[in-house]
Structure formats: C-alpha cells, structure tokens
C-alpha cells in the first residue's frame, strides 16, 4: 500500500521575495553584529527575528506585535525553507519582540548599524550617490501627550493643530528614494536644527564628498549651509528673503527688468527623448563665510535667478509667500514681478539645473 504523503498548505504571499531581498542586503548578519544579545538567549538570533518580523509588517501592512506570533505559526514551513533557519512560534512571542525593540532603540548602536547597512547596500548594488534629498514630515495621531514623549503638540503640516504629532527627518538617495538616515523626534521640535545631524550621519555612512544635498527652505540656515560647504559637499535649497543681504533681491530683479542680464535657457529631457524649455535665468556669485567648529569657513555661493517657462508641461507648486529663492550653493528666484495679492508659483528643476551647471 502506498504511503499517503504529508501535505503542508500555507499561504506564501510575497514572503519569500521580501526575505530574499533582506538577505541580499545583509540585514540579519548586520543586525546580529551591531546588536549583541545576552548569552542566555535561545532560538532564532535577534537579526533573524527582526528580519522575519519586518517581512510580516511589510506583507500584512500591520505593525502590531500581537499578530506576529499567530502569523508565524501559520507559515513555519515557508519561513524555515526561505531562511534556512529553525523557525519556531516561541521565537515571536510579545516578550521576545519587546526585547528586540529595546535593543534596537540604542541610538549609538543604531547609527553604526545604519552606516554599515548604507555602505553595504551602495557597494553591492553599485548605487549612484550623487544626490541626497533631505526633508522632514510629521504624523498626527489620537495619542496621549506625556512629558518627554514623542507625541507632542507642534506646528501641524496636516492642518490638525488639535492633535499631537511625531516628527520624522529623513535623508534619501535621489531619485531612487532609498533611506540613508532617519530620525524620529518629538512633535514640538523645529525642523531647522534637524538637518545638521541627519546630514552628518549620511556623510559618515557614505564616506564620500562632492554630493549634492537637496532640501527645502528650512535647510537654508547659514549654519547648515556652512557645514555642508565645509565638508566639501554642495547644496540646493530655497533661500528665504531674510537670508539675503538688504536690497540684494530688488537689485537682482531690477537688473533683469532693465535688460542688463542675459537669461540662459534651462532644458529638461522628456520621456520621448526631446528637450523642452522649462526655465531661464542667470547666475551670480556671493562670497560667504561662517564659523564651523571654531574655524571660519569661506565658500562662494552660486546664485541663480530663474523664471519658470509658462507651459502646460510644467506642474507648478503654489507658494503662499513671496519671491523665495534657491541656492546650489545656488539660488532660484522668480524674475517676474508677482501680481498683487496673488501667490508666487514655483517649479522644481534641480536635475536640469545640475546638467546646465
């Protein structure tokens, strides 16, 4: 009599794909190297517990710990075959996951892990690191505000000042969008002081100079620009009018209106391979200096006055205030006189400007 085979039925979904990708990134090994555990720890290592837990979060779209253990229990064979590890349900109890979270909350070890992961990923995938985008966002929630907690009342980007929020600052490879550094801070914190530590971590992890850091107007503080310039890197950001010398904006615009400046066209390559005019403007230079770590740093800011081309191909972004500018060490300004009581409109042309420069 033929023996009846033992058939295992499990829902696979995208789990093998997620786990394979994380293994190629070296995630389990890097986590184990940077977050050592107590000698009495048994079962799966912290790195593998974290990796499988992350695959659960990504596959289910749910970060709650209470659902992880039963999720694993229904996929023991799939997880074991995919990872090559002896996966057990007891490796994912709430107590075990809480220990993992406490270990991962060590800021010093996390910074070292983040740096090692960036270096490994950039090297393995031969990623371009020419441009880094730095920006912050906030997330509101129906949470309880506690002293020293992450959720605090602050300036709400969600237009919900009645809700506490948490703030996230992140630096990503542009245009890929791969995170390089992430900081989660309490919601009442201002954006301006968050740029320097985030950029410094990216510089330490990549170990390269000559990168272009792209940010919004809150990255335009002179301290932030001085640190980037002193490090041998470059920046592209809107420069608020308060950062300009008195009369500089008016003089720069008047030079255009009087016809004293020749405007240079800026083109962008379309998906069909054709070039389209997206803006025109001119450049001038301004000597800059600022004290950084006790030493006076000097650099030359290349400032661009730019008028966006009026065409349906552009997607303008409304601005409430107005004229602002961009600096790469460079500034982009509107060249037209804005109509009275109407917002100034902007279009971002960083890649095209880089090619032009």
Predicted regions and their residues:
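Anion-binding and metal-coordination hotspots
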Residues: 1-20, 25-357
């Amino acid at each position: 009599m033929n023996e009846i085979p033992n058939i295992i039925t499990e829902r696979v979904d995208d789990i093998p794909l997620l786990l394979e990708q994380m293994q190629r990134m070296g995630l389990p090994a890097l986590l184990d190297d940077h977050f050592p555990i107590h000698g009495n720890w048994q079962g799966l290592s912290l790195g593998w517990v974290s990796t499988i837990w992350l695959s659960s979060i990504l596959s289910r779209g749910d970060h709650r710990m209470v659902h992880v253990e039963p999720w694993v229990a229904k996929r023991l064979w799939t997880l074991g075959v995919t990872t090559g590890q002896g996966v057990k349900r007891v490796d994912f109890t709430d107590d075990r996951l809480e220990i993992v979270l406490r270990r991962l909350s060590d800021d010093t070890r996390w910074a070292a892990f983040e740096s090692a992961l960036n270096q490994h990923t950039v090297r393995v995938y031969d990623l371009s690191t020419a441009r880094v985008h730095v920006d912050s966002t906030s997330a509101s929630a129906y949470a309880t505000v506690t002293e020293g907690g992450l959720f605090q009342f602050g300036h709400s980007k969600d237009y919900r000042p009645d809700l506490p929020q948490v703030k996230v600052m992140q630096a990503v490879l542009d245009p890929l969008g791969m995170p390089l550094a992430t900081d989660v801070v309490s919601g009442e914190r201002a954006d301006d002081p968050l740029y320097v530590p985030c950029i410094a971590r990216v510089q330490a992890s990549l170990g390269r100079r000559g990168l272009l850091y792209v940010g919004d107007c809150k990255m335009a503080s002179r301290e932030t620009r001085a640190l980037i310039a002193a490090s041998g890197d470059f920046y592209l950001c809107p420069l608020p009018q308060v950062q300009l010398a008195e009369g500089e904006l008016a003089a720069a615009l008047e030079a255009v209106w009087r016809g004293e400046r020749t405007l240079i066209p800026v083109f962008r390559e379309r998906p069909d391979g054709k070039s389209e005019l997206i803006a025109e403007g001119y450049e001038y230079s301004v000597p800059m200096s600022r004290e950084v770590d006790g030493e006076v740093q000097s650099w030359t800011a290349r400032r661009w006055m730019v008028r966006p081309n009026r065409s349906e191909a552009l997607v303008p972004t409304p601005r409430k205030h107005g004229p602002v500018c961009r600096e790469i060490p460079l500034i982009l300004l509107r060249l037209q006189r804005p109509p009275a009581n109407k917002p100034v409109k902007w279009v971002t042309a960083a890649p095209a400007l880089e090619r032009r420069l």
